[in-house]
Amino acid sequence: METSLHKAPQKRQVTAIIFLLLLWEAGSATITYSVLEETDRGSLVGNLAKDLGLSLRELITRGAQILSKGNKQLLQLEQKSGNLLLKEKLDREELCGSTNPCILHFQVLLKSPVQFIQGEIQLQDVNDHAPEFMEDEILLKILESSLPGAVFPLKIAQDLDVGSNTVQNYTISTNAHFHLLTRNHSDGRKYPELVLDKALDREEQAQIRLTLTAMDSGSPPKTGTTQVVIVVLDINDNAPEFAQGLYEVQVQENSPVGSLVLTVSARDLDAGTHGELSYSLFQSSNQVLQAFEVNTDTGEIRVRKLLDFEEIQSYRMEIEASDGGGLSGKCTVVIHVMDVNDNAPELTMSVLISEIPENSPETIVAIFGISDPDSGDNGKMVCSVQDRLPFLLKPNEENFYTLVTERALDRESRAEYNITITVSDMGTPRLTTQHTITVQVSDINDNAPAFTHTSYTMFVRENNSPALHIGTISATDSDSGSNAHITYSLLPPHDPQLALNSLISINADNGQLFALRALDYEALQAFEFHVGATDGGSPALSSQALVRVVVLDDNDNAPFVLYPMQNASAPCTELLPRAAEPGYLVTKVVAVDRDSGQNAWLSFQLLKTTEPGLFSVWAHNGEVRTTRLLSERDVPKHRLLLLVKDNGEPPHSASVTLHVLLVDGFSQPYLPLPEVARDPAQEDVLTLYLVIALASVSSLFLVSVLLFVGVRLCRKAGETSLGGCSVPEGHFPGHLVDVSGTGTLSQSYQYEVCLTGGTGTNEFKFLKPVLPNFLNEGGYRNTEENSNFRDSLGFS
């Protein structure tokens, strides 16, 4: 490709040709570009994508990057097009000096996977410098006795360009005595020699002035001129001569300014002023003139500025010794600069990834190059990082290294690493360079939230206020950022009957649990559910914990008396035989409390009784017992008021009224069964059963009466006296029980007990007494008392 460069001041056009070369050597590819110096910034060097055989997508995906030696980047890669552009205008003389060819090295880094491709730019010289003489006038003294053919070297011109653009030829102005020859130095430089064609005559012309022109071969060529003044001298027989024509010496590059390098010596056999010598540099380059100086009187060559082996390894110069008569002699001095380990290794960071994911082994952290301009062992380098760090250095081509992770990192264990890269050379003493980089380990969502407990137990007292805070669950996540942001939730309960969403709510941000409504211990003593903690990562991770809510009982239920049932229409009556001993069990009050714990601990107390001191109740089991023997003075009917109280705070109580009927000769206490709650559906069936049973008993009773009457009529025995007692003979049904006692009730009663276990009800039916033929007064009185007794109980 061709690029036209316009230089405004001169209004001329310079054509720059940029071409691409692919070199394949030793199985590796080197991309070589050729660029003219002074090409404008941003100019196209080549299309890197095409030159590498990659598509633009591949070039971007693989993370192509241009690396230059040193810290100065000369090229830039245009990602959207794959073009390689100049980052700045390049000056060959500044970058390479007199070195030819001028080659600038760079590397192409493909990051994924890592691959280095060597590249170089051959910086082509343009003729942007004209030859220039260091002196405006060159003084040359020649003896008039010099013979034709004598050669007189002249000082050279300097041209910073190289190749054909540097000095290629010298010319001298037309004259009658001299012609000019252009010679080649061993280093390739051109120098002029003046050749005498015709003998000189001082008396005829004591001084001759000539114009010396230096010309390069650029396009267009450039020239430089100086004046040569030739002074014709009288005859002088002897010219100065050096002890040797070539001097070679070595000097350390760290030699201080002013240090002695070499002393050259010449002698002149003439006496007087013709034997006095002066020394000077002759036909020397700018580099020599800047680095060394010669003592004109002693011939000592001393260091003029600090030398640098890495810049120039040797100097070649001509030393001229001139006597007072104008004659001179010359010698060549070659100074070799010796390398010392004066340069510490340099580290140039090309790629630095300051944040890497925690779970990726062999992840590229940095790519860097190291260099040491010293030579030999002074330029050999070793590179390392600290021990016990999970990082490895992998060497690449041309002193490039890749720093990678040795294994997967764990941000939760260590979130930051300070890595010190140490580069040491092998010189004596060793010089070291250290570069510290900080690498942050980025988080990935590799840790699920962890609850502080696997299960939580929370207590809430029943009858709580709605929205009551009952407890808090807590989970932690070792990750960071959104990966550690935890959201709490209620998980569906295992029991489908548990309406969890109507009982409990949870704050999704902080895990606080609230009771949505008042809880009832008697309906629900405890329930369990699971809570979940989910982080904000992608994909999200979660965990769960068990929460058990225990409802604490409040004393909100009064005791309930199961037995005896309190029914206003039919008060419960217990029968107590008058012959009962003290401690006789009259009945037992049975009560329950729907509360629990001490709220359900019941105690019994006798509050009120018809006959104080006759009855007592056991506080813990509700048994009503007699406290003494009954007497004739005790009224036959007693009313007891009992209190059933729980142990809650505040306590609740219930009262029960008990009727006790004193009877003579009753051998067993009357133990009515408590009436329990019945299902209305069962009550109809039980009623039917009861009617059937009642009809059966009535029929049996009627048959018994008829049998009894028949037996009485058939008896042939006479009636007994008034003091006797007629006892019916024959078989009595099993439901007729003799209750004859020793007391006041000497008559025989028959009674029917109807007990139905299913209903818990009881009925007593007293029949009329079977009266013998009592004619005495006592028998009448007893009958009257019994009648009164019946009436008081409401029996007929």
UniProtKB/Swiss-Prot annotation:
| Signal peptide start and end residues | 1-25
Keywords, in A-Z order: Calcium, Cell adhesion, Cell membrane, Disulfide bond, Glycoprotein, Membrane, Repeat, Signal, Transmembrane, Transmembrane helix
Keyword Glycoprotein on this protein?
A: yes
Q: Drop me one GO molecular function for this one.
A: calcium ion binding
Instruction: Enumerate the Cytoplasmic topological stretches.
Output: 712-796
- Principal subcellular localization: membrane
Q: List the disulfide bonds.
A: C96-C102
Per the record, GO CC terms?
plasma membrane
- Keyword DNA-binding listed? The answer is no
Give membrane topology per the record.
Single-pass type I membrane protein
One family name in Pfam for this protein? Cadherin
InterPro entries, sorted:
Cadherin-like_dom (IPR002126), Cadherin-like_sf (IPR015919), Cadherin_C (IPR032455), Cadherin_CS (IPR020894), Cadherin_N (IPR013164), Protocadherin/Cadherin-CA (IPR050174)
GO annotation, biological process: homophilic cell adhesion via plasma membrane adhesion molecules
Write down the superkingdom of origin.
Answer: Eukaryota
Where does this protein reside within or beyond the cell?
Cell membrane
| Glycosylation positions in this chain | N169, N184, N418, N567
Which segments cross the bilayer?
691-711
Relate the protein's function as given in its record: Potential calcium-dependent cell-adhesion protein. May be involved in the establishment and maintenance of specific neuronal connections in the brain.
Q: What is this protein called?
A: Protocadherin beta-14
Which organism is the protein's source?
Mus musculus
Taxonomic lineage is: Eukaryota, Metazoa, Chordata, Craniata, Vertebrata
Q: Source gene?
A: Pcdhb14
